[in-house]
């Protein structure tokens, strides 16, 4: 059963819950009647603090906040390329098809297309020993991007007991089953969820040394970017 809390106070995008809600830090929650997406950012002396990622106008004390039990996460898999997302991986182009240019509050759309089938090459077979980072499938996402699906870092070493043949699969369809050393089994798909607050582990990171010339003088002069690097221009929450 989902844990819930009651809104005690609201200050812009920040919502306060009084009492022991049972939520965890970084847990994803749904706020109010419109199920606005939020994240638990503070737990202190019987007070829970939630940051809401949408406009809070009209939200009132007494409304319910429902926990998901999971950290706020994104879905990693084929279909990310060519998509435009907001900060919590909502696909803006898909939302625009249903709600127009202005996003309605509380709108919920799958981050990636869960119905589309991708032709995939399964790179492991029964009996193979796999561990975190082992490539289990390759999908030609675009003409130049080969998407490689891997064993998640959270799964320890195990043995493949079932592997699907090469073919067309949705991103959530099980393609490989592994038996862990403790005897439990895990089904893996082309896509996997990953908490946004936890950095993805890397074996080797190449330094970014080639400039990315944007043609925008304020960026190229004051905020130069590197090819292969990461940049963000943050705005206000809920705007």
Located regions from the model:
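Residue "hotspots" at secondary-structure boundaries inside conserved domains
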Residues: 21, 57, 72, 122, ...
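Short, compositionally biased
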Residues: 42-48, 78-89, 145-166, 185-201
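Short, surface-exposed secondary-structure boundary micro-motifs
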Residues: 20, 34, 70-71, 89, ...
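N-terminal accessory targeting/assembly segments
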Residues: 1-96, 101-104
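ATP-binding Walker
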Residues: 239
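Hydrophobic anchor at the beta1->P-loop junction of P-loop NTPases
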Residues: 233
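P-loop NTPase nucleotide-binding/switch module
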Residues: 97-153, 170-230
């Amino acid at each position: 059963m989902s844990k819930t809390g009651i809104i005690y106070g609201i200050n812009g995008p920040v919502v306060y819950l009084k009492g022991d809600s049972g939520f965890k830090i970084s847990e994803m929650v749904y706020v109010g009647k419109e199920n606005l997406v939020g994240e638990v950012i503070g737990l202190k002396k019987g007070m829970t603090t939630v940051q809401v990622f949408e406009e809070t106008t009209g939200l009132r004390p007494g409304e319910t906040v429902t926990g998901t039990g999971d950290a706020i996460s994104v879905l990693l898999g084929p279909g990310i390329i060519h998509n435009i997302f907001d900060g919590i991986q909502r696909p803006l182009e898909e939302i625009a098809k249903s709600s127009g240019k202005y996003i309605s509050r509380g709108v919920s759309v799958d981050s990636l297309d869960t119905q589309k089938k991708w032709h995939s090459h399964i790179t492991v077979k029964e009996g193979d020993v796999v561990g975190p980072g082992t490539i289990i499938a390759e999908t030609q996402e675009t003409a130049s991007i080969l998407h490689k699906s891997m064993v998640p870092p959270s799964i320890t070493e195990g043995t493949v007991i079932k592997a699907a043949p090469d073919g067309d699969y949705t991103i959530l369809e099980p393609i490989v089953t592994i038996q862990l050393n403790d005897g439990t089994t895990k089904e893996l798909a082309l896509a996997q969820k990953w908490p946004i607050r936890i950095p993805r582990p890397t074996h080797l990171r190449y330094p970014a040394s080639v400039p990315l010339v944007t043609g925008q003088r304020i960026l190229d002069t004051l905020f130069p970017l590197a090819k292969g690097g990461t940049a963000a221009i943050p705005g206000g929450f809920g705007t």
